[in-house]
């Protein structure tokens, strides 16, 4: 089970948008955590948030939304969650994660769960010199306390910091959060206090370590930019390790859900928005942007092509300076340079269907809604406003005139 803490205001972001809704890889921080959590098939994913954010999250499917009525700190948020989570039993393992730590990997969470045996809870730490993070106090191989850095007079240049994620059995978590006392200076309840509470109750507390990049907590726009950089670097490595060629990896940008098949080649300066799936052996040329689009095996898209809300068939070529929107293109078709699908009439968008083995000549405009059937040919420079029957040639440009210059 997951408890995601998302009630913080994020004042340092200087934004009207709640902090956890700021995006990395075209998905919000909260979406990253939920996306990863779902890969682990938990019985319950609960998000604790304030009322205004709850209203914005009601579109989320299969997520339990829990309102923290007053912003009384992370300890109060978890206490509210365990009191309200559905079908919670003592033996359930609960992962508590802050909503501003979107880069935590499932392999790390799995390692923490494995470390939980014989312990009340397990925390995650990382080495850093950044004094904004709380510090893990380790004695004889066990975690004894988490302290805020400003309260720690003996802090070293580099220390083991708190990454803001805990794993515990529901029974232990429920009992420990009930013992958290209100901080006298801030009037908040700190979740980190449960470590010292557990130790005083003669319970073992474990810890696992990771690197600072994975544990990045996002509190400012600068942190957001760093997290975007780390995310993109990780995705580039993932795809190259998966058999995808990135000609200039640092110039290619991915979304959280981008899928690319083996032996595809991605050329420089390509941007993948949400919802892109690319089959094996495809080629995506320079300066191409794709969003909500499926590209078939062996297809070639770009350079300077934008494809949006479209399905592009196997071995189809859309090679130069084209816009393909709300369009389905069949197999082995060729879309010539400068082709534009005119899908928006000023009020709503319309679909275009281009069949298999079609040829669309350069500088053509296709006015949706439109159907171009299999094996049709559209002559260069045509403006197509009516459906094209199967195996037909269509020419709409005027006859060329040649006149003598006086």
Swiss-Prot record:
Region (Linker): 222-242
Pathway linked to the protein: Nucleotide-sugar biosynthesis; UDP-N-acetyl-alpha-D-glucosamine biosynthesis; N-acetyl-alpha-D-glucosamine 1-phosphate from alpha-D-glucosamine 6-phosphate (route II): step 2/2; Nucleotide-sugar biosynthesis; UDP-N-acetyl-alpha-D-glucosamine biosynthesis; UDP-N-acetyl-alpha-D-glucosamine from N-acetyl-alpha-D-glucosamine 1-phosphate: step 1/1; Bacterial outer membrane biogenesis; LPS lipid A biosynthesis
Keyword Heme recorded: no
Annotated binding of Mg(2+), by residue: 100, 219
Gene Ontology biological process terms in this record: cell morphogenesis; cell wall organization; lipid A biosynthetic process; peptidoglycan biosynthetic process; regulation of cell shape; UDP-N-acetylglucosamine biosynthetic process
Region (Pyrophosphorylase): 1-221
UniProt name for this protein: Bifunctional protein GlmU
Annotated source species: Wolbachia sp. subsp. Brugia malayi (strain TRS)
Higher taxonomy: Bacteria, Pseudomonadati, Pseudomonadota, Alphaproteobacteria, Rickettsiales
Name of the encoding gene: glmU
